Amino acid sequence: MEFKDCFNELKKDFVNKDVSNVPNVVFEFNVKDVGVFYAKVQDGKLDIQPYNYYDNDVSFTAKFEIYKKIINGELDPIKSFFTGRLKVSGDLGKAALLQSILK
């Protein structure tokens, strides 16, 4: 799958998530063998862009299929981390915010 298609599909799934009560945070998503995008929550609004965000709070690395299942609620991100399907670097406290966004 090409990056543009991957990004658009994940963005479509992500864009309607409620972030009104989520503190400011920047997640960077490295999609293995495809590319990188970020999701930035600021002042209760979500911005998703197809670029690196070098000053991110937390960075995730996984295959496209894993992200798709996590975003759609089919796979728990914390369990994915502990089973090695999802790699996390950066602020683990802020990484946990991802789960609150996806609920």
Residue ranges, per PLM feature:
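Feature captures hydrophobic
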Residues: 1-103
